[in-house]
Amino acid sequence: MGLFNFLFGKKKENTTVFLGVEEILPNSNDTEDLVVLGSVRGTIHVGDEVIITNLGSDNDKSAKAVISALEDANKGQVKKASGENVLITIKDGKKYNVYKGTVLHSEGVSEAKLRAAYLYAIINAFLFWQDGILTDEDRRRFSIADLIEIWRQSIRFCDTQATEKNYAYYLEKIIILMEQVRAKLLTLDEIYVVYSVKTGEPCLFMSSTRNQDGSLEPSELRVRLIPTVYKESMTYPEEFELRRVENGPNKDGISNFLNEVIFLNGAEGIEFISEVTSISAKALVKAPDLEGMREVDKPIMNPELVRCLLMIGQIGDTTTLGKRDRDFLSNLYLNRLTEALKTARFIVPIKVEGELPKPNEKGETSFAEDVKYELAMKELKDNKKAVPIFTDWKRFNEEYGDGWRGLLQPLGGPLIPHPVLINGTLYFETGNETKDSE
């Protein structure tokens, strides 16, 4: 089955007309007309007025234009045309934002048909007309949504249509698309992220398989990104919400966000729209080189620990999992949390007279008996108190400002013998008992 039927299904009688632009053909600079190549569903006529729609654009509005000429691959100049490889001349088309993937259509075409024409055009352009090579013009014109769709549909096409002989060929093209999406991401003005309402942090999504006994086999945990063009159409249960991440004038906001969710929150990658189109953390950002660095000099980051904290918080009473899976994952990440706590270093809010003593080689700090200091203390429900401790400087600085300093200590260190509250959410006391402070 060819790509056309793969996307559209079997041909049916059409009373409407639509096509996706697969190629822009060069023509004289003396004319404002634009010549494009596409596969027409229905029948298009010279003189027809069509709507120009860019499904992958964040801000393009639909426009109307007139078809001034048609050329059939077999018949030459014609007054009407349908089928594949039709040349369409759009009167004054150069003044519109027409590029590969633009859909020309009549009134009344369904969203599903518009999307099918769009996908057919961009896949055909990339995989077949261009042999899997993105041109400089493509890199400039394609939105991140366009690139993600080509990437996603190429994976689908490769999985269902590729043969053993050409599978490696298509896989190579898919890797190219992933790299282009990664590069495009860092240049955007904004991107939307799926957050967990309960934790207030970017939600960690898990794709998993099931073992023979029916238990889950979880894979890496990823943060889900949504291009702006999809933010209105994506729906999630009430336990999730979309939040905007701005790139800022220096175009470093998204990069900073990625560094935070990977190195501070423990995300193991990102995914766009769904798990199909994902990029691992190693392919996104470069990890700091800690080789040979003294423990005291290492940056305070506890990604494994925070990853477990966030997953325990997310799982809770989520409606997206059954009780058996919730219990299994809760125990899994609680066990991993217990292991991570053994080697974690925390930042403790403290007020002290004079200078803080320098920590030892292990990053631990101790005071002489005559030094006066005050540890921060949190009042919890049930008249309990706990010392707030933090997994990184970002979280510490968000809650404790002037007058407070950060002291580095392991859990159970000499200066924090009390029960502790990790990042304001997890209460911990002797016996490794943990629970949500709320």
Which role does the model predict for each range below?
Residues 13-114:
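Beta-strand/loop-dominated core regions that host nucleotide or nucleotide-derived cofactor-binding catalytic loops
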Residues 2-12, 112-438:
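An interfacial alpha-helical scaffold signature
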